[in-house]
């Protein structure tokens, strides 16, 4: 019995190691899921630590999934502020709009520079959702050191030692769970704007 338990633990550990090994160390090598791919099941934690789950195969409504790095990132704050121009229109058109970052649940709102934001922010601090959508990448030691010089401790903000972030990405997914639009850019300073997101999603909303 003990031997079988040890074997199970070994298999589990190896599978986890394989998953981490599959995450590129260079954001330019990230290959996000594509238009026409089935969206994976994913989940995230609310600021209260409540898990929100999105099963694969079918969603209750068309869904926009937005990956951003964290509330500590100035470009993320600019993007979240810009998307206030379109997020209410998306919801009024029947979309679920979900924002995922690697921030710990308790940091989701408190870390933002702009406080007047009422989005559905979910914590993906273990990067499981980012890995499932294939937008995660590993930070090398030089990048971690550079971030620390700016007062950003990724282990503290995520609560893990995984040293992963998502490439900023946007997925528009239909009710059948099929990805209909993808924006993913390894240059974290360039983000999808509100007008472009509405153009991408409005056609699906009209169906």
Spans of model-derived segments:
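Bacterial N-terminal signal peptides
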Residues: 4-17
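N-terminal "domain-start" segment that seeds a small globular fold
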Residues: 23-56
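Short active-site neighborhood of thiol/selenol oxidoreductases, capturing the structured segment around
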Residues: 55-81
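Solvent-exposed coil/turn segments that connect beta secondary-structure elements
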Residues: 59, 70, 102-103, 126-127, ...
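Structural microenvironment flanking redox-active thiols in thiol-disulfide oxidoreductases
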Residues: 78-134
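A short, polar/charged loop-to-alpha-helix boundary motif
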Residues: 188-203
């Amino acid at each position: 019995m003990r031997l079988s338990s040890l074997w199970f633990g070994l298999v589990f550990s190896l599978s986890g190691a394989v998953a981490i090994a599959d995450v590129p160390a260079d954001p330019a090598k990230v290959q996000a899921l594509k238009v026409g791919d089935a969206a994976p099941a994913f989940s995230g934690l609310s600021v209260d630590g409540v898990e929100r789950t999105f099963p694969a195969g079918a969603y209750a409504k068309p869904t926009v999934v937005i990956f951003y790095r964290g509330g500590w990132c100035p470009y993320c704050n600019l993007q979240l502020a810009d998307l206030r121009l379109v997020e209410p229109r998306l919801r009024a058109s029947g979309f679920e709009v979900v924002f995922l970052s690697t921030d710990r649940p308790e940091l989701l709102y408190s870390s933002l520079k702009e406080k007047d934001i009422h989005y559905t922010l979910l914590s993906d601090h273990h990067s499981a959702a980012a890995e499932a959508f294939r937008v995660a990448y590993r930070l090398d030691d030089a990048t971690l050191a550079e971030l620390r010089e700016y007062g950003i401790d990724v282990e503290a903000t995520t609560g893990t030692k995984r040293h992963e972030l998502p490439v900023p990405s946007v997925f528009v997914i239909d009710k059948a769970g099929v990805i209909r639009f993808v924006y993913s850019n390894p240059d974290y300073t360039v983000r999808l704007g509100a007008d472009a997101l509405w153009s991408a999603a409005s056609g699906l909303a009209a169906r």
